[in-house]
Amino acid sequence: MGDTSSLAPSAWPWLVFIAAVLAPFAMSSGGINIAILTMLFIYLSVAWNIVGGIAGQFCIGHSLFLAAGAYTSTLLSLHFGVTPWIGMFAGAAVAAVIGVLIAWLSFRYTLPPLSFALVTLALAMLGYLAISSIDLFGASRGLTLPVRGTPATYQFGADVWYYVVIALHAIGAVALSAWLYHTKVGLYLRALRDNERAAHAIGVPVLRYKMLAMAISAALTALGGTF
């Protein structure tokens, strides 16, 4: 066996990346499905971490943003023929607006962390009840897209390509999160997480950056909803 100790540290992420992308091509159907779900949850975890980890705001209503992405892109595809590759960004915009509104209503009145968490959970449940009751959203039946089997409609002939798509989503989310962490925005968000009063005292616009964190996290989550 070769000596891997001579590999530069910077080479390891690339090796892991190549292995992660190529591995499913040698897996069984069941293994690919597990890999797809694993990558999806990695992606959603990174999306949640922007508001819950970096900014320190414990939101447990991200299923609402996931639904916003899924239903927006699906409705646009069913009624207007918009490809999900475009509809997913419309869903991200809708989720970002919802996230900003939730953050504005919650943080403008300085809700404590536990109350904010419960508000987001309650709104997610209300969203579920609304979707389950409105015919436009398919009510309890849900919505069904016609099977076209073309990449342009976000449908692929082999499951492995779904893995490739969600793996690229996850890699992009990790890269975005890592970049954001080291920017001025990331510095402000960490300041809010560590000591909100001190951050406010030195001039950090608390409400604005909490809303921004919520918007970014919601938009990324919605992209996963389209998937």
Over which residues does each language-model region extend?
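Transmembrane alpha-helices and adjacent helix-loop boundaries
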Residues: 1-227
